[in-house]
Amino acid sequence: MTHDPKSIAVSYIEACGRKDFDAVAPLLSPDLKFVGPGNTLTGAAPYLAVLRRIGAVWVKSDVKKVLTDGQDVCVIYDFVTDTPAGAVPIVEWLRIEGGRIASVRLFFDRVAFKPASDEIAARANAGPRT
């Protein structure tokens, strides 16, 4: 595994967009810190659970720009959903330490994301799709 912060960040975003959360897991520090609109988590396992849950509506990540400053990487992308929300602009500020993502700061418009949030909840309550 590369320790280049930009490569790690892009691998993470691409794997998330493919819903390949098994590929995401080794990119995360076990004690990862996550801060986003309405949510704060500590630990890779709870964060992966959230990613898997939102995977229900996640079609792909359409990366627009990747900015780096040492161990900090900012990824700007459209979170493309299969909901009326469509593509929601997202910014993730990732801190890479020891070749793994140590922290994630997530920024997005909660109003624009609401149709996706509603659908995530509905699908979680409905159980697995057949």
Predicted segments, located by residue:
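C-terminal and inter-domain tail/linker signature
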Residues: 1-130
